[in-house]
Amino acid sequence: MCRTLAAFPTTCLERAKEFKTRLGIFLHKSELGCDTGSTGKFEWGSKHSKENRNFSEDVLGWRESFDLLLSSKNGVAAFHAFLKTEFSEENLEFWLACEEFKKIRSATKLASRAHQIFEEFICSEAPKEVNIDHETHELTRMNLQTATATCFDAAQGKTRTLMEKDSYPRFLKSPAYRDLAAQASAASATLSSCSLDEPSHT
């Protein structure tokens, strides 16, 4: 059974609080709109040591692969915050919008949302125009004539590759993530130590 943080020694609580604060500072500017499948707020397990340990493992897992980062709500929020510092958050927001788009089952809603995404991210002088080649741009434009769940696949793939090869390595090397990963390692070790040191109750 998970032990509550309230039962941990003060030093353990302070370490967990410090880690949470550091992550909060790192993410506080990350605001993903509902149209992109909102995942902008980090989730900190404040009640159970197991949740906090899993959270630390989540942070450390972001450096294992880009897929793991994108599959983590906290990872997406952290990566989005980093991209905002580079003024390139539109790539991730477009990718997320495409992921949500694929879940639409109504043909009418699909067509309407397809045009919204195109106007926001693809068309010339779009407010959040992504950097894709002319061929992909034209292919996507043609796909909108008969919108399907896959009409943005080519453009989404291009932006994903760009993020994975360009932005993702810089994110991992950023002082913010390296410091966060160090804190995650320390927090994980501390929580493990506290769990072992906590007196048993009978």
Swiss-Prot record:
User: Which PANTHER family does the record match to this protein?
Assistant: REGULATOR OF G PROTEIN SIGNALING, REGULATOR OF G-PROTEIN SIGNALING 16
- Give a brief account of the tissues where this protein occurs: Abundantly expressed in retina with lower levels of expression in most other tissues.
Q: Assign the protein's first listed, main location to one coarse class.
A: membrane
Positions where lipid (S-palmitoyl cysteine) attaches: 2, 12
Where would you find this protein in the cell?
Membrane
Q: How does it sit in the membrane?
A: Lipid-anchor
Q: Which Gene3D superfamilies match?
A: 1.10.196.10, Regulator of G-protein Signalling 4, domain 2 (1.10.167.10)
This protein's assembly is summarised as: Interacts with GNAI1 and GNAQ. Interacts with GNAI2, GNAI3 and GNAO1.
One Gene Ontology term of the biological-process aspect is: regulation of G protein-coupled receptor signaling pathway
Keyword Lipoprotein recorded: yes
According to the UniProt entry, which residues carry Phosphotyrosine? 168, 177
- Which InterPro entries does the record associate with it? RGS, RGS_sf, RGS_subdom1/3, RGS_subdomain_2
Keywords, alphabetical? GTPase activation, Lipoprotein, Membrane, Palmitate, Phosphoprotein, Signal transduction inhibitor
Post-translational modifications: Palmitoylated on Cys-2 and/or Cys-12. Phosphorylated. Phosphorylation at Tyr-168 by EGFR enhances GTPase accelerating (GAP) activity toward GNAI1.
Positions of transmembrane segments? none
Q: Which residues form the RGS domain?
A: 65-181
A Pfam family for this UniProt protein? RGS
Instruction: Tell me which GO cellular component terms the UniProt record holds.
Output: cytoplasm; membrane; plasma membrane
**Looking at the keywords, is Kinase present?**
no
Name of the protein described by the UniProt record: Regulator of G-protein signaling 16
Q: Which GO terms describe its molecular function?
A: calmodulin binding; GTPase activator activity; GTPase activity
Function recorded in the entry = Regulates G protein-coupled receptor signaling cascades. Inhibits signal transduction by increasing the GTPase activity of G protein alpha subunits, thereby driving them into their inactive GDP-bound form. Plays an important role in the phototransduction cascade by regulating the lifetime and effective concentration of activated transducin alpha. May regulate extra and intracellular mitogenic signals.
